[in-house]
């Protein structure tokens, strides 16, 4: 079965929350007459997730992509603004910038497979408005360094936490370092509602704007129609009560999920230490999610030989998350030639980020909690794997590496 750890632990808790919604007969967040829209499953999820991560506010959405758009809108990112984002990420981190009529500026990663803070300042121009660090594969970015740069240049920071729900950096939850955090509850994420997401922040104005953008302009106090009292032009990105029910049950399981993943990853990793020609990606903080173990080979040739024998692929060739494979970005395939992204003088091309290319040609993902061929992680273990199963997977990987 493919999916994230949350999809492996569905049980009675999710069923109970779902049946509550079915029996109430109100699937819409505001669907119970006379009941405040902040009393249902979605609202309870927002409250409990905010408490767990340390946000003052959480806004539930229908997708991580929607979460990113709401964050950009809340900050007023728009026509011709430049936003710095790594070249190794899911396409939504880049495409949402374009959707807001802004210009993505692609940045190099380092051997943590997250944005390299030392390469950010050289990309800043008078048009730069924000940085989007992506906590890729559940590994926190170096947020202290990134925040120093942002403060120095008066830039906003949107943390893309879509693959890192519950991760921490230096004791502080990912998503709480910057101005806003965007999170995903997709099936391949740490916890899941199939599709879904949320925005986290603590600033009142940003909260009101993010909420309004995701709910047709309504303010968070929405009760019925608010003619003359809307905060911003928005669209519909709301989460429904069925998704909210699953999100609530999964949120309550998140601490246990993370603890289990970290323990199982540590066991797998301990048996692969000290092998010739290979190490691991740098983990910026042990508060990472533990969803994947990334092998980093000394050479592209060794990585390719390993993949051939293991029946997998290096990250560079896994498909979904590498800028080289995003032809609609590279070729500026916007829905109209009048789009500022299409007209901007900035060009995009394969291999424009040589450091990123080199790292990803040598990197191989082994699943721990996220089983996803799109991440190059179709082989490995999952959250329910036993000690014996983990030992066997480790032995198989060792045998292949030693035979290279």
Give the predicted meaning of each segment.
Residues 210, 304-311, 394-397:
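Short amphipathic alpha-helices in soluble, non-transmembrane regions
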Residues 217-218, 310-317, 397-404:
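A common structural junction motif
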Residues 332-404:
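PLP-dependent enzyme catalytic core of the Aspartate aminotransferase-like
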Residues 26-35, 39-82, 96-98, 106, ...:
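Phosphate-binding glycine-rich loop
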Residues 280-351:
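Conserved PLP-binding catalytic core of the aspartate aminotransferase-like
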Residues 73-161, 168:
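PLP-dependent aminotransferase-like
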Residues 1-34, 366-368, 372-374:
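N-terminal "arm"/small-domain region of PLP-dependent enzymes with the aminotransferase-like
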Residues 164-170, 177-291:
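Active-site region of PLP-dependent enzymes
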């Amino acid at each position: 079965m493919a999916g994230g750890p949350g999809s492996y632990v569905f049980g009675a808790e999710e069923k109970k929350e779902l049946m509550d919604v079915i029996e109430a007969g109100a699937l819409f967040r505001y669907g119970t007459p006379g009941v405040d829209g902040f009393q249902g499953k979605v609202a309870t999820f927002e409250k409990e997730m905010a408490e767990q991560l340390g946000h003052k506010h959480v806004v539930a959405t229908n997708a991580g992509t929607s979460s990113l758009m709401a964050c950009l809108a809340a900050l007023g990112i728009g026509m011709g603004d430049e936003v710095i984002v790594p070249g190794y990420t899911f396409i939504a981190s880049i495409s949402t910038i374009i959707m807001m009529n802004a210009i993505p500026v692609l940045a190099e990663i380092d051997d943590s497979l997250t944005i390299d803070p030392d390469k950010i300042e050289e990309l800043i121009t008078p048009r730069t408005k924000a940085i989007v660090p992506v906590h890729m594969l559940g590994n926190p970015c170096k947020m202290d360094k990134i925040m120093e740069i942002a403060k120095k240049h008066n830039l906003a920071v949107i943390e893309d936490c879509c693959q890192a729900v519950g991760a921490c950096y230096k004791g502080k939850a990912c998503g709480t370092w910057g101005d806003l955090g965007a999170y995903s509850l997709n099936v391949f994420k740490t916890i899941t509602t199939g599709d879904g997401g949320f925005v986290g922040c603590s600033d009142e104005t940003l909260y009101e704007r993010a909420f309004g953008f995701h709910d047709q302009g309504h303010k968070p106090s929405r009760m019925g129609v608010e003619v003359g009292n809307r905060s911003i032009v928005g669209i519909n990105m709301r989460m429904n009560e069925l998704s909210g029910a699953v999100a609530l049950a999964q949120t309550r399981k998140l601490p246990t999920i993370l603890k289990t993943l970290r323990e199982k990853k540590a066991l797998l990793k301990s048996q692969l230490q000290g092998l010739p020609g290979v190490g691991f990606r740098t983990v910026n903080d042990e508060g990472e999610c533990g969803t994947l173990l990334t092998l980093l080979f000394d050479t592209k040739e060794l990585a390719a030989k390993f993949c051939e024998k293991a029946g997998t692929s290096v990250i560079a060739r896994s498909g979904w998350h590498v800028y080289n494979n995003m032809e609609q970005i590279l070729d500026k395939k916007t829905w109209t030639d009048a789009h500022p992204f299409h007209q901007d003088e900035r060009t995009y091309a394969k291999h424009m980020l040589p450091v990123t290319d080199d790292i990803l040609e040598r990197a191989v993902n082994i699943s721990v909690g996220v089983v996803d061929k799109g991440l190059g992680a179709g082989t490995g273990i999952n959250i329910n794997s036993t000690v014996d199963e983990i030992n066997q997977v480790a032995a198989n990987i060792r045998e292949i590496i030693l035979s290279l």
